């Protein structure tokens, strides 16, 4: 059964396949040298860096906040990723929310995003984030349904972003 886990090297091959899929938009990977990450040692360093982002003192770009990065995996298969931002900047409050997630294209339309968000809520409780702000694009009907299935209550729309508050408890 698929589960949210901290980033792990055991899905190296599948992760590389996922980011190479047509229609996958890994904006979160824009600054990554994907060719370099084919090397297991380099990938292990990347994984360690992902894990470290949950700490307050980890190096990160200006304006970024500590975040717990989780990968949704089934055995050695990478299905998607989810990030929990530990606090909100003004931009995150207005547009980005506490949680961001995506599912690799070949795994979409199987309920994975719904399950990912459901499994993320206990992590949010441990981080004392309750309620959880989750946003989606105005035209992203699938994501809107995911958020509403998780109990999200619509707050408002800001410049094309729908904002929902999801109870973590």
Which residue stretches match the model-derived regions?
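Conserved active-site alpha-helix within GNAT-family acetyltransferase domains
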Residues: 114, 138-156
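GNAT-family acyltransferases
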Residues: 1-98, 102-105, 155-169
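Active-site acidic-Proline motif in GNAT/NAT acetyltransferases
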Residues: 101-110, 139
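Conserved acetyl-CoA pyrophosphate-binding loop and the N-cap/start of the following alpha-helix
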Residues: 107, 111-119
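Conserved GNAT acetyl-CoA-binding A-motif
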Residues: 124-135
